[in-house]
């Protein structure tokens, strides 16, 4: 399955160039099985061999990232904080989440929205998800777009640049991104475990 997906991704970039990169990155933001660690390094390789430029690939990928982020932002914003609060009030107990927990999370995001979006766009697995709380909190659109773009430029430049440098060995980028993903998953698991332990201690 993943092999077929990788082949399709490469075929799209071969046929459409920078436009294909932009479209794939839009899809990658809203459809996680499309992996940026394949899209972006391969785009760098294609540019390195002369079919386009590295700069064009970075610009295209960044435009795609912003458009994809806006899709998730728009969906979350259409739900809004009131509906989310009502959902937590009704069903939060099934997830061990109380309205007070949601309020604290919202307050934290409101204080750190810019940093969360900017840095979140540079972190595997978090890159797309960070658009959701931004939408729920209806973060002002201009800062959201600007800092989504800035964070995406960092990520896109790193992976496309690596692909261009490695050339036909661009696939070597993927294992390093995989390690970062494992680290992120481990951190998330630890945070969830800490949250669960804290909740249990409060009930005891």
Residue ranges of model-derived segments:
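Transmembrane alpha-helical segments of integral membrane proteins
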Residues: 156-169
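Short amphipathic helix-loop junctions that connect adjacent transmembrane helices
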Residues: 40-48
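Membrane-interfacial helix-loop-helix
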Residues: 1-22, 49-132, 136-139, 143, ...
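Transmembrane alpha-helix interface/packing and boundary motifs in multi-pass membrane proteins
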Residues: 22-40, 120
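Residue-level signal for transmembrane alpha-helical positions in Major Facilitator Superfamily
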Residues: 35, 39, 127, 158, ...
